[in-house]
Design a protein with these regions (language model features):
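Oligomerization/assembly interface segments of phage tail-like spikes and tubes
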Residues: 47-79, 128-142
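Polar/acidic, low-complexity leader/linker segments enriched in S/T/G and N/D
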Residues: 1-43
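Intrinsically disordered, low-complexity segments enriched in serine, threonine, and glycine
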Residues: 144-267
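Beta-strand elements of well-folded, non-transmembrane domains
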Residues: 66-70, 120-122, 138-142, 180-182, ...
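Short, acidic/charged, Gly/Pro-enriched secondary-structure junctions
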Residues: 67-115
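Short, solvent-exposed beta-alpha or beta-beta edge segments that form flexible loop/patches at the rim
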Residues: 27-63, 119
Length: 267
């Protein structure tokens, strides 16, 4: 059972709270876990309904209940009650207009995190606030694994192989930084057959392509937007193969960074 978490770099237990369960079952409940919706087309009077597309309609949602940690509570006050000021702080910390990183303390969740924000519902008993239910809504239908970084040097027409560690079949746009070591038109290939091409590169030029599909160059004179074919390099993952390749026609140094999807929930 989860007892502690870290949100936006701040740890719950440092403020005197712990993950609890008000109904005696568990501290976290999963509302949605990577549920796909399948779109069909009806054929043969409905006797066949093959899939046309599939989509994730909703983000992952999880519920955590918190209360005062009675082992560390100030014994001069009610050990269970949360003051108005403390509840204000909790809401200021947890309820944000933009997503932040949530990670759970414990070996079972080592290397996993989620991005999102909370809504807070107070629990009142008698005249005091005894805790809160935190409803966490992610920015995706699943969580993430810690960033994977691969880097090194490639000679012209040399190939580097690495594995995609994502739980989700498909592809991910990574952050990729390339230092070109010779003049020329750069071509970047993966095993999926896509070719990323950037023309008129110069030796020692640093090219950056991020996961939000933005490209930039360290060379102010290189009009890279005009020389890029807008085929972005992707990290691929199929059920039968997780192997990716990096192949370039020019000598380069490279760094590829991506966040694998993790189909893991807090329980």
């Amino acid at each position: 059972m989860v007892t502690d978490f870290i949100y936006d770099g701040l740890r719950l237990s440092d403020f005197g709270y712990a993950v609890v369960s008000f109904d005696g079952s568990r501290g976290g409940e999963v509302d949605t876990d990577s549920q796909l919706s399948y779109n069909h087309v009806s054929m043969m009077s409905g006797k066949r309904q093959p899939y046309i597309t599939s989509t994730y309609d909703d983000p992952l949602k999880m519920e955590i209940q918190i209360g005062k940690n009675v082992c560390t509570a100030d014994k001069s006050e009610s050990m269970f009650n949360i003051s108005v000021e403390d509840m204000e702080f909790l809401k200021r910390w947890l309820v944000r207009p933009h997503p932040h990183k949530l990670s759970v303390v414990g070996d079972d969740y080592l290397g996993f995190y989620w991005m999102g924000s909370f809504n807070v519902t107070e629990h009142v008993f008698g005249d005091g606030r005894i805790g809160a239910t935190l409803e966490f809504e992610c920015d995706a239908p699943f969580g993430y694994k810690d960033d994977v970084v691969v880097y090194g040097d490639l000679n012209a027409d040399e190939t580097f192989r690495y594995n995609c560690l994502s739980d989700e079949i498909g592809w991910i746009y990574p952050d990729i930084t390339i230092t070109v070591k010779e003049d020329g038109d750069l071509q970047i290939k993966n095993s999926d057959g896509r070719v990323t091409e950037i023309k008129n590169c110069r030796a020692n030029e640093v090219i950056t392509i991020d996961k939000n599909l933005q490209i930039s160059s360290s060379s102010a004179s290189h009009k890279i937007a005009d020389d890029f074919n807008y085929v972005f390099y992707r990290v691929n993952n199929s059920f039968n193969s997780v192997v990716n390749t990096l192949n370039t026609n020019l000598a380069i140094s490279y760094e590829i960074r991506y966040s694998p999807y993790a189909k893991v929930v807090i329980v």
